[in-house]
């Protein structure tokens, strides 16, 4: 290697200031899933609290007064697991302990490697099992699931997931289906995480599940928004690509205090991220769980320029290379947008080179008119992680060989070797980012629900991303 590299590794960030390290509390059922009509939802919920005010051991059950949480869940895995009898919890779109246990049980029964994680192979096997059971009349009704002496998801049924442990008042799950339009079916349940009680009181959450085609759900958009209690904060977790033209999405956007997405699951990352960036200009707050995954990279970048001699050289950066897992470049674009927004770079050109490596080249102009060259490279990996498009490594450098701004951040051996092999006459500071255990979707979502208002850094970074993607569209 022609360059000089000063290695600082490994570096691990702990988030003790963000979340508790204690286990989630036990979860008990106040009302098992019950099918109801749309018109009877509120009256049935009121009845739950009237008949369940006094619990066993003198505990009083009361509804939380925190926030409403709506989940748009197009993935049918949870619903299929319930229909086949593997899952007996609420349909809430959240992959908590109970869902993990249910997936493991189903995988064992279907002859799929029991990882507790969903996969295309598992989804296909689950869909085939559902179709067979439906054809043979072996699907379980809600009542039958409740009366089963043993539940396959029992291993995780006594533990509240991260979201339930945060004591939401009401969780509304929308499950769009692909069957014939037969209106919308509703189901209610209520669960209580057993935390430290105050005056023998259990703080419980209502679950409302609505199933129907996309058109059917859109027709009752007014009913759905009314179910989000108007006096409490309203969060919407849209577990799909943003659909600016879909009437239900527009309605939820206008009624929610915050829309939460995860750009790592976008079907068309560039087009969907463009839509998302355009929404950031609206009054409603937008949050992307994929942005939260960049925190270790951002903190290490900032830390690299803490020494005075490096801080004074930050304006000399005019080269940036970012490697990411091929398939989704949302994280790479957002990190680039963050750096550019901090250094006041303006994007001026964009080009794309398809191939084994997906190469995106963006040219910026600094405030002093200095040209900046950026390159994003999608690397094909044999062993990809759970999150498509995770950053692998990045390099900040300068054409000024005397500038002390050379920085390499990498997440593994391959990433470090590739960046260090670039050579050059600069002295590079190298740091390794160690994978964190608390970066999964459920935990990121739990932290997001504890935040209020807009994230100025995210908004400013997405303004740069929007400008980059508009250049891409123009090209």
From Swiss-Prot:
InterPro entries: G6PDH_assembly_OpcA, OpcA_G6PD_C, OpcA_G6PD_N, Peptidoglycan-bd-like, PGBD-like_sf, PGBDSf. Gene3D superfamilies: PGBD-like superfamily/PGBD (1.10.101.10). PANTHER family: OXPP CYCLE PROTEIN OPCA-RELATED (PTHR38658:SF1). May be involved in the functional assembly of glucose 6-phosphate dehydrogenase. This is Putative OxPP cycle protein OpcA. It comes from Synechocystis sp. (strain ATCC 27184 / PCC 6803 / Kazusa).
